[in-house]
Every structure is written in C-alpha cells, then in structure tokens.
C-alpha cells in the first residue's frame, strides 16, 4: 500500500500495515489498522492525520505536560544526586524541546478514524518510558499513561 510516496507493508505479526513517515522532523514508524476501512481513501485519511500531528505539536505537548510537568523536578533531582548525567539542571523548555514522536498508530475508520502516538525524549527525560497520547476523531488529545 502506498501513502504518498511511502510504501507500507503488511506485518502479519501485528496485523497492521507498517511504514515510515516524517513527523516533527524525524523518520517515524507509522502503523495502520485498516480492518474497519470500507473503501475510504486510506492515503487521504493517513495524510490528514499526520499533517494534523505536524501542525499541532504544541497542543499534544501541552496535553502531556498538564499531567506530567513534575518530570522536570524528577530529572533535576536525579541530576543533583548524580543519577542522571547532564551539565546542569533542566528547564521546562529543555524538557519540552527534548520530546519527539516515537511512533504513530492510526485506526482507519472513515470519519471515525482515531489515532495515537508515543512520545519519547532525547535525552531520556522519560527514563525509558514512552508517553501514550490518544487523539480521537474530533482531535481531542489525552495523555493515556506511560509505557515501557
């Protein structure tokens, strides 16, 4: 299956199409669940959702930080104790600027298409975890917990 100029291949292990697209300036794994797609233009739907992620980084990060701004203090405590290597304390901006999209999953269902993404950080301010962000078909963003 082609999405734009990118080939997505079916992965029997996960039962989804898998490909790589640019999200927030990085090549990102994208998983497509097309089980409930009924003749829709999958290419159009996927492109719309990826473009929405591209243009709504601030909204996604804000939804994450509303429930997780304490991570800045946690990392700073770890830096002070020598448990996290850094040149000095980090700010909230440092934390936010370290976030990137690790992967995206899109459940293609026409107008009911919803999607999710995992945020990661470099440096690893999430301490080996990924932040699961859920986005419904009305583009409401919600933090769904930490993975890993």
Regions found by a protein language model. Give the residues of each.
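Long, contiguous N-terminal structural blocks used for assembly/anchoring
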Residues: 1-86
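Acidic, proline/glycine-rich low-complexity IDRs
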Residues: 1-10, 14-18, 97-99, 103-148
């Amino acid at each position: 299956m082609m999405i734009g100029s990118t080939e997505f291949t079916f992965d029997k292990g996960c039962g989804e199409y898998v490909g790589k697209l640019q999200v927030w300036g990085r090549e990102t794994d994208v998983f497509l669940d097309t089980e409930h797609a009924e003749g829709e233009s999958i290419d159009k739907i996927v492109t719309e959702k990826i473009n929405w992620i591209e243009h709504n980084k601030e909204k996604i990060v804000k939804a994450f930080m509303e429930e997780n701004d304490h991570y800045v203090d946690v990392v700073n405590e770890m830096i002070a104790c020598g448990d996290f290597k850094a040149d000095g304390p980090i700010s909230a901006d440092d934390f936010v600027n370290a976030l990137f999209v690790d992967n995206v999953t899109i459940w293609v269902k026409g107008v009911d298409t919803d999607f999710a993404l995992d945020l990661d950080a470099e440096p690893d301010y999430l301490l080996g975890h990924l932040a699961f962000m859920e986005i419904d078909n009305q583009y409401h963003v919600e933090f769904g917990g930490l993975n890993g």
